[in-house]
């Protein structure tokens, strides 16, 4: 027996690694693999990429009114592949929001919000709001004109909340004006608080998802576990559309002869 096999047996005996891997990877997929099942996994991969690129940016970023913009400029011009690092983080955030919207739409179409998956749906919606909070808090961090004025608009909207709006605005911006305290608060929320809450809810979301399984698409035949074959490619859709609309239809005149 090789050293690798012995190490694998030892880990399986102590920690159950092979059993855990079979549980994680041996998930039944109703109707077989399809594009509509990709959005959740793609979103998780994008979130992990955001964490990795965000950690790389945090090594060089300085959350200060005097040095925030210059540190971002340093990352893009002096750090090796810094422009790529920031580009992946910046554009990856936009892609993550789009994929989250697609994932939400897919769950709506499949009825994944119904019993017994209501809690999975509610946590997913909460994760979407947290993702938008990531976008809001991260937009200010470069301390450029777009981030500054976008944050002022967001804080002005927060100030309109009845009773506690003014307190929320002062708490978020660190006083009466915008400056270093605003940056440090947004940075702490963006890099520490939101990731902890987000990853915890992701774990709960995945556990609930694995408990109830994938919601089968409406086209899956009842009791068969598979979907009828359909041509979903561009050429297949074109052929189906042409066949349907080019069929001769009986003429039904709107007039009647005397």
Please give the residue ranges for each predicted region.
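Membrane-embedded alpha-helical bundles that constitute the cytochrome b-like, heme-associated redox core
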Residues: 1-258
């Amino acid at each position: 027996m090789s050293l690798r096999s012995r190490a694998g047996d030892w880990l399986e005996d102590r920690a159950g690694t092979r059993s855990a891997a079979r549980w994680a990877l041996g998930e039944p997929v109703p109707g077989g693999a399809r594009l509509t099942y990709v959005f959740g996994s793609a979103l998780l991969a994008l979130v992990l990429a955001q964490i990795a690129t965000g950690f790389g940016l945090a090594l060089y970023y300085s959350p200060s009114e005097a040095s925030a913009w210059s540190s971002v400029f340093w990352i893009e011009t002096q750090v090796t592949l810094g422009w790529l690092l920031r580009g992946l983080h910046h554009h990856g955030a936009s892609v993550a929001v789009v994929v989250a919207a697609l994932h939400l739409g897919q769950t709506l179409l499949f009825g994944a919000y119904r019993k017994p998956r209501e809690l999975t749906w509610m946590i997913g919606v909460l994760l979407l709001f947290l993702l938008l909070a990531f976008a809001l808090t991260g937009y200010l961090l470069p301390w450029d004109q777009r981030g500054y004025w976008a944050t002022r608009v967001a804080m002005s909207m927060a100030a309109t909340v009845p009773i506690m709006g003014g307190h929320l605005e002062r708490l978020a911006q660190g006083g009466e004006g915008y400056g270093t305290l605003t940056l440090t608060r947004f940075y702490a929320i963006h890099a520490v608080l939101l990731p902890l809450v987000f990853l915890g809810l992701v774990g709960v979301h995945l556990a609930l998802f694995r408990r109830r399984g994938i919601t089968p698409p409406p086209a899956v035949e009842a009791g068969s576990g598979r979907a009828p074959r359909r041509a979903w490619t561009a050429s297949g859709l074109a052929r189906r559309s042409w066949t349907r609309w080019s069929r001769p239809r009986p003429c039904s005149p709107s007039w009647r002869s005397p």
